[in-house]
Amino acid sequence: MKIVGWDIGGANLKASIINFKNYKIKSNQIYCPIWLNIDNLRKSIISIKNNFGNCDYHAVTMTAELVDIFKNKKKGVKKIIELFCKIFPEKKVFFYSINENFLKRKDAILNTDNISSMNWHASASFISKYIKNCILVDIGSSTTDIVPIK
């Protein structure tokens, strides 16, 4: 099984693929000025898709919904969801939620506030299972999150 984790940032698109058959991980990052044109995101996703080849599932976090090209955060989330589900089969795409679960397209669109800017939460939730007392610092191109974990 192969799973790609995507982080759609405000200026960069990051993705890592995990191959559970041979336990190999491959990562890719592309500068992606989404605020100039949403098509930059589409082209970047397709570039990484072509680099990684076929995979079974896609797990997505985002902060790009906050860039100026979108009228508001909700519209940005919906646009990004729809874009992903046009490139990949909808049944293979899941969006990380604040409830520590993954939502399919329909539920993600109905719960945009629960998936908007959840990249920090995904990292903090994962780390908290292994380290009980620390500070997570997530420095991106457009946001910085400082999260105490206790």
Residue ranges of model-derived segments:
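Nucleotide/phosphate-binding catalytic cleft detector across ATP-hydrolyzing
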Residues: M1-G10, S16-V137, V147-K150
